[in-house]
Regions:
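Membrane-embedded helix-loop-helix hairpins and adjacent transmembrane boundary segments
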Residues: 1-495, 501-502, 508-512, 516-525, ...
């Protein structure tokens, strides 16, 4: 990892566009690799394996199909924000909003919330590094957290997005290859996938791991997929890459192939976590985050198992560097006084953010899944105002502020007073945390529309989106795919099918294939216009 980090620092420019956006030069294949490596983080490896340990295979469609379908919103939003980014010289969402609305208040509000939302997600990475270090060497978690933080900060400070993208390519390949090696080892030790699934289904204590009843309600299922759809494009590090894309066609190719990468990334940790319940049936919520390294070390021994655990390090490093760079750009370009010395600001901000994330990872007792869901809910609230600002030229900055404050107020209420949701909604606690996204998005959208109407309707403002006739069919097809993914007709189904997996797993995979086909046709038509 150290050698690759040094190699990645070649031919780097020092201007902001080169440092933060790699000169807007990311082509389709590179964009796909860096988006995937950045998005598939410690949450992917340790959070998803821990969650599947607790709730079983129902977490696979939620993550693999759900994050794969998120590419649709990336494509719809990405083309417009890339254009606005070039138009305004913007490198962050708040900068784009400032360019469109002329409101410094809107810029400051959005940037502040994005930075606050990123801190708990940033803490996931050193938390996971500590897990790997402890599994490999038996020392305290905090040592691994500190060492990995130091390495990531070092090459991010000196390299910018070009260095991050180069390390993403290497780290992504390492993570994916070694995760599949780890899965092969665990499955072989269990006697094969079918044998492992049969053992799970034949025990009263584990049979619920092959079903959804008791693990999800339909509302939680739908809410979680909605959360991914609206939250992921608002991740500062993913938004930054959309701005850095070479063309709309590059974004289209990335969005088309993203579902395949999502399935490849989530199958290993989720299957390992589920199978791990056979060997370690009594882990608590926080302890279940360790199930993947524990299983791999058990079946692979210290050397081979340790090699596979490098996959976790590669995944978390490829996300942490991107988070530091993107969040640093929010602070230096949106929050700090423009008169501050540019290079000093970059370095001090990135170091400060890394220390905040490190501190939260060491002293917080929240699980990796808890930290991730908190950050995702805060991100999702940004989507309506960013989408509106990108598509309309006369959005009022006060409407953006109202939208953000209204939505985040609901998120804060969900965190500190979940009982307030009883009686009219679902208490957003534990597995039901994602349900907060629907009322928070409703509040955000209401704040945007009502405030915009109050200040702008007398000037003839219209909410009418311009949609090409050729876009209607693919949009309708993708909507059908999303609705079909909420397969309530198989909700109580636990009967296993091919490879011992429930049929609703295969159904979700088939829907991702359908999504890919629709996207390929749509992107091809748009590119030929």
């Amino acid at each position: 990892m150290v050698i690759f980090a040094i190699w990645a620092r070649r031919d780097l420019g020092r201007g902001d566009e080169s440092y933060y956006l790699a000169g807007r030069s990311l082509t389709g294949p590179i964009l796909l690799v860096t988006m995937a490596a950045t998005n598939f983080s410690a949450f992917t490896v340790y959070g998803s394996s821990g969650a599947s340990y607790r709730i079983g295979l129902s977490f696979l469609p939620i993550m693999a199909f759900g994050t794969g379908f998120m590419a649709v919103s990336m494509y719809i939003l990405g083309r417009k924000i890339r254009s606005r980014s070039v138009q305004h010289g913007a490198m962050t969402a708040p900068e784009m909003v400032m360019g469109q609305t002329g409101s410094r208040s809107a810029q400051l509000t959005m940037a502040s919330v994005l930075v606050l939302a990123t801190i708990p997600y940033l803490a996931l990475q050193p938390r996971a590094a500590g897990i790997v270090f402890s599994a490999l060497f038996g020392g305290p978690d905090w040592i691994g957290a500190v060492l990995v933080t130091l390495l990531v900060v070092a090459y991010t400070l000196t390299g910018g997005l070009k260095a991050v993208v180069r390390t993403d390519a290497v780290q992504g390949a390492i993570a994916l290859g070694l995760l599949w090696l780890g899965l092969a080892m665990v499955v072989n030790d269990a006697g094969g996938i079918s044998t492992a699934m049969d053992a799970i289904s034949s025990s009263e204590s584990t049979e619920e791991l092959l079903g959804r009843e008791g693990n999800y309600t339909l509302l939680i299922w739908v809410s979680t997929m909605v959360l991914w759809l609206f939250a992921d494009p608002m991740f500062p590090q993913l938004y930054q890459r959309l701005c850095a894309a070479e063309s709309d066609a590059a974004i289209g190719r990335m969005a088309t192939l993203y579902p395949a990468v999502a399935w490849l990334a989530f199958i290993p940790p989720i299957l390992i976590g589920t199978i791990g319940h056979l060997s370690y049936p009594d882990l608590d919520r926080a302890g279940s985050d360790n199930i993947l390294p524990t299983m791999i070390m058990d079946v692979g021994g210290e050397w081979l198992g340790g090699l596979v655990l490098v996959a976790g390090l590669a995944a978390l490093m490829s996300t942490m560097d991107s988070q530091l760079l993107a969040t640093g750009s929010l602070v230096t370009r949106d929050l700090l006084d423009k008169e501050s010395p540019e290079d000093w600001s970059r370095e001090s901000v990135i170091i400060s953010l890394s220390l905040l994330g490190l501190a939260l990872s060491v002293w917080s007792d929240l699980s990796i899944l808890d930290l991730g869901l908190l950050a995702f809910s805060m991100y999702a609230v940004m989507f309506p105002s960013v989408l509106a600002s990108a598509h309309f030229d006369d959005i009022d900055g006060r409407a953006v502020v109202a939208s953000i404050l209204a939505g985040e107020a609901v998120v804060i209420l969900a965190v500190f007073s979940p009982e307030s949701f009883s009686g009219w909604w679902v208490e957003p606690v534990r597995g039901a945390v994602p349900t907060a996204v629907i009322p928070s998005l409703f509040a955000s959208l209401t704040g945007l529309v009502v405030t915009q109407r109050y200040f702008k309707m007398r000037e003839g403002f219209s909410w009418r989106f311009k949609i090409n006739n050729s876009d209607i069919a693919p949009l309708a097809g993708l909507l059908v795919v999303f609705v079909m993914a909420q397969d309530f007709w198989w909700w109580g189904e636990t009967e296993t099918w091919a490879l011992g997996l429930p049929r609703w797993i295969w159904w979700s995979a088939a829907l991702s294939i359908a999504q890919t086909a629709i996207m390929a046709r749509w992107v091809g038509k748009v590119s030929s216009r």
